[in-house]
Structure formats: structure tokens, C-alpha cells
């Protein structure tokens, strides 16, 4: 007889492949459903079938072109050498146009490729959001996931499009590349007087750490009471059993307060959404409303006077 271990488990549920019915469309489900032993170790073992739909296919097409444009530009920057491309990959970048071009179209070699890649990437992401929203509606689900993703997209657009638009030139945007992106982040903070004194950045970090803490607390709690039926959270929301009661009692003993089986998910959702949303607000205020966050902090008693 298999023994259930709720950290590492050897028990995997295998049934006939299942999926919810969907209305007939242009694109049918793709692939024959199967099972993966290793995926079953961390999640549902079933793989497929996959439904992309019109927006899903278009999103992948636009995303492919964006990656190709970025990739070929990075390769061209090392004289088309695969060896150098692999060696310097983390340092390579595709830079936005210089400030002299403003919001206009720049020559390809001077930021034009960045603009084209940004258009394709943004279109791909927005189409994927539409796909998520429409799939949720088709399955008669709530659209919570789509709106959480929209918050992340808002931060993405604030960095690459909305703030540069407010500043009057695309040179304020973020380059494509790993270390170039990190260098931009560092320079951005230095140019505007230490971004750490931006209160919306503080809120964003608080929600980021809070999201990690809430996820750890919730995950640990459910695993701790799963042997008592705590994994059936939906049932425990409307008809609390011993698992929900014990979990609630544990947290009241620990910190004097407990969430419910329903409210913990709402807390986690809001913390995750507000992490990127407040981050985007902080980005949009930088350079447009506040030129130096350290001086702003000194003026409002947030930073020590020099």
C-alpha cells in the first residue's frame, strides 16, 4: 500500500485523460493527451491536449518574430560568431534609440530594430492576455488570472512605452538583454536620486515579500492538514471540517489571527497584483513628477538630511 507523503510523494493519480468541453472554433485541440512521470512528481501528470485558438497562434507568431529580431541583433553584435554569442550572451543587448530621435522611428542600426522587436513583443503579450481572458470565459471561470496578468503587463508597458511616451523619447526605455537590463536598472536609480526612496517602490517590495510570505504560509498550512482533508479547500470554504478548524486554531495560537480557506487566496491575489501595479506607478512618477527621490525623501522626512 502506498504511503502518502505531502512533501515528496510517490503517489500519482492516473485516470483516463480528461478535459472540459469547449465550443467548436477555427483551431481544435492539438496533440494526443499523455502522462509524464516526472511532471506527476510536482503537478498533474497529464500533458495535453493544448488549445491555442486564433489569439494563441497569433501570439506565438508575434513572439517568435520578437525573439528572432532580438536574437539576430545580439548575434550580429559579435560578428555572427556562435562561440562569442554563447560566451558573451549575458552581456549582449539590443539598445533603444538615442534621445535625439525622440518618439520617432530610428534607423534600424540605431534603435529601429529595438522598436520593431518591442512592437512584436508587446503585441504577443497583449494577444496572450486576450487568449487567457477568452479561455476563462469559455470555461465559465472567473477572470482573476487574466486581471492579475494585466497588472504585470501594466508594469511592462510603463517601463517600455508609457513612461518613455511621457518623457518624450524612447531612450528612457529598457534595453533587451540580461545584464544591459540590470545596468539600466542601476543607472535609473542613480539618475533619479536613489529609487529606494520612492514610496511606491517601497510598497512594491513590501507586496513582493508579502506574496512570498503568504504563499509559504498557505502552502505549508495546507500541506500540514492535507492528511485531514485540507487539500479539499473548496469544500472547506463552505463546510469547515477538522482540517480548516485546526489550521485556523494554529494561526490564532501563532499570531492571534487567521485567514479563512477563501480569504487567503484573496490576500495572495491582491498582494501579487499590487506588487506590479505599485511598481508601475513608481516608474511613471519618476522623471515626470519627481526628478530626485532622495531630495523628495528629505523634504518629506523620509530620508536623512545630508
Swiss-Prot record:
PROSITE patterns: REACTION_CENTER. (7R,8Z)-bacteriochlorophyll b binds at residues 181, 201. It is a multi-pass membrane protein. The keyword Transmembrane helix applies. Keywords: Bacteriochlorophyll, Chlorophyll, Chromophore, Electron transport, Iron, Magnesium, Membrane, Metal-binding, Photosynthesis, Reaction center, Transmembrane, Transmembrane helix, Transport. One of its GO terms (biological process) is photosynthetic electron transport in photosystem II. GO terms for molecular function: bacteriochlorophyll binding; electron transporter, transferring electrons within the cyclic electron transport pathway of photosynthesis activity; metal ion binding. Fe cation binds at residues 218, 233, 265. Pfam families: Photo_RC (PF00124). SUPFAM superfamilies: Bacterial photosystem II reaction centre, L and M subunits (SSF81483). InterPro entries: Photo_II_D1/D2_sf, Photo_RC_L/M, Photo_RC_L/M_CS, Photo_RC_M. Belongs to the reaction center PufL/M/PsbA/D family. Reaction center is composed of four bacteriochlorophylls, two bacteriopheophytins, two ubiquinones, one iron, and three highly hydrophobic polypeptide chains (designated L, M, and H). The reaction center is a membrane-bound complex that mediates the initial photochemical event in the electron transfer process of photosynthesis. This is Reaction center protein M chain. It comes from Rhodospirillum rubrum. The lineage of its organism: Bacteria, Pseudomonadati, Pseudomonadota, Alphaproteobacteria, Rhodospirillales.
Amino acid at each position: 500500500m502506498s504511503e502518502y507523503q505531502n512533501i515528496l510523494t510517490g503517489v500519482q493519480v492516473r485516470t483516463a485523460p480528461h478535459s472540459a468541453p469547449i465550443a467548436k472554433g477555427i483551431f481544435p485541440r492539438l496533440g494526443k493527451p499523455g502522462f509524464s512521470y516526472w511532471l506527476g512528481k510536482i503537478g498533474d501528470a497529464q500533458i495535453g491536449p493544448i488549445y491555442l485558438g486564433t489569439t494563441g497562434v497569433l501570439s506565438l507568431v508575434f513572439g517568435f518574430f520578437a525573439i528572432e529580431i532580438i536574437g539576430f541583433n545580439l548575434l550580429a553584435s559579435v560578428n555572427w560568431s556562435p562561440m562569442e554569442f554563447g560566451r558573451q550572451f549575458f552581456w549582449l543587448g539590443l539598445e533603444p534609440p538615442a534621445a535625439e530621435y525622440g518618439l520617432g522611428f530610428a534607423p534600424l542600426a540605431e534603435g529601429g530594430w529595438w522598436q520593431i522587436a518591442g512592437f512584436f513583443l508587446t503585441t504577443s503579450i497583449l494577444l496572450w492576455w486576450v487568449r487567457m481572458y477568452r479561455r476563462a470565459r469559455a470555461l465559465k471561470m472567473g477572470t482573476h488570472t487574466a486581471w492579475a496578468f494585466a497588472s504585470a503587463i501594466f508594469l511592462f508597458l510603463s517601463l517600455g512605452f508609457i513612461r518613455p511616451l511621457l518623457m518624450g523619447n524612447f531612450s528612457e526605455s529598457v534595453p533587451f538583454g540580461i545584464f544591459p537590463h540590470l545596468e539600466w536598472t542601476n543607472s535609473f536609480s542613480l539618475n533619479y536620486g536613489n529609487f529606494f526612496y520612492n514610496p511606491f517602490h517601497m510598497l512594491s517590495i513590501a507586496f513582493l515579500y508579502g506574496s512570498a510570505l503568504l504563499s509559504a504560509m498557505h502552502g505549508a498550512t495546507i500541506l500540514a492538514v492535507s492528511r485531514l482533508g485540507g487539500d479539499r479547500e473548496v469544500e472547506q470554504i463552505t463546510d469547515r471540517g477538522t482540517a480548516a478548524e485546526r489550521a485556523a486554531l494554529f494561526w490564532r495560537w501563532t499570531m492571534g489571527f487567521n485567514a479563512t480557506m477563501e480569504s487567503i487566496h484573496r490576500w495572495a491575489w491582491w498582494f501579487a497584483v499590487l506588487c506590479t501595479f505599485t511598481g508601475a506607478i513608481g516608474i511613471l512618477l519618476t522623471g515626470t513628477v519627481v526628478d530626485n527621490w532622495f531630495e523628495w525623501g528629505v523634504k518629506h522626512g523620509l530620508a536623512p538630511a545630508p
